[in-house]
Design a protein with these regions (language model features):
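Alpha-helical transmembrane segments and their helix-helix packing motifs
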Residues: 1-248
């Protein structure tokens, strides 16, 4: 679902030259991914970092928390790769004479070239906003409230250009696929000034330059900056909520 949000937001933003405006347009559309997850009961790795609240509250063990995160992480990866493949073969990247395919390459090149420090810090900032969106959605009492609770924090992380490991499971692989198409490659070199060396650097090994630090940052942002502080700030309310949900 996050991959679908990434695909549709890229389609909307790829033809906009102004970076700020392009991010704003993408930010308006991208939140649909998390909305679908929340409303259909899906699992998202970054949101599940909030399980740490149950760990600190002794409702689940660290082993159960880590097991959940590992299973969900790789499930999200499989789902994203399926969407990547469908998007590529659907011809979606042919939009604007192949410019969307070139845009996918440009985005992927930028992401695999990220420094470890930037990946971690950007990942922290991203998942602070994602986890806040999840908590706000849980607090909202109706669908409209949940929609707006999700919309603004997720829009903020997209506009801010922060790194989200699950979103990158769409952006990087689809860019790698696009890099195998000579039409998209030529367009990327023409429109964005990318070199053949940069495009050839789109490999699984180089993708780890992004996934490892960004995943670490997302975990820190969700657990250390949101989950644990929120547990201690709202400890009594959290315990009461758990007690109430047990009786329902």
């Amino acid at each position: 679902f996050i991959a679908l949000g990434g695909a549709t937001s890229s389609t909307a933003a790829h033809g906009i030259d102004n970076v700020g405006l392009a991010r704003f347009v993408a930010g308006i559309i991208f939140p649909v991914g998390l909305m679908i997850i929340v409303f259909v009961g899906g699992e998202l790795f970054t949101g599940n970092c909030l399980i740490v609240m149950d760990v600190v509250g002794k409702k689940v063990t660290w082993f159960e928390c880590v097991r959940n995160l590992i299973v969900v992480y790789f499930s999200n990866l499989i789902g994203a790769l399926i969407i990547d493949t469908l998007i590529y073969f659907s011809g979606n990247l042919d939009y604007s004479g192949g410019l969307l395919g070139a845009y996918a390459i440009k985005v992927a090149v930028g992401k695999v070239g990220i420094s470890p420090l930037k990946g971690i810090t950007s990942g922290i900032l991203c998942n602070i906003l994602v986890c806040i969106a999840i908590l706000m959605a849980v607090a909202a009492t109706d669908i409209v409230g949940k929609v707006w609770a999700i919309f603004f924090p997720i829009m903020a992380f997209v506009v801010g250009g922060f790194e989200h490991c699950v979103a990158n499971m769409f952006y990087i692989p689809v860019g790698m696929m696009a890099a195998q198409n000579p039409v998209y490659v030529a367009k990327a070199q023409e429109a964005y000034g990318l070199t053949a060396e940069q495009i050839q650097g789109l490999t699984v090994l180089h993708s780890l330059n992004n996934f490892i630090p960004v995943t670490i940052g997302n975990i820190l942002g969700g657990m250390v900056f949101v989950g644990i502080p929120c547990y201690f700030i709202y400890k009594k309310k959290w315990q009461k909520w758990h007690a109430d949900t047990k009786t329902v």
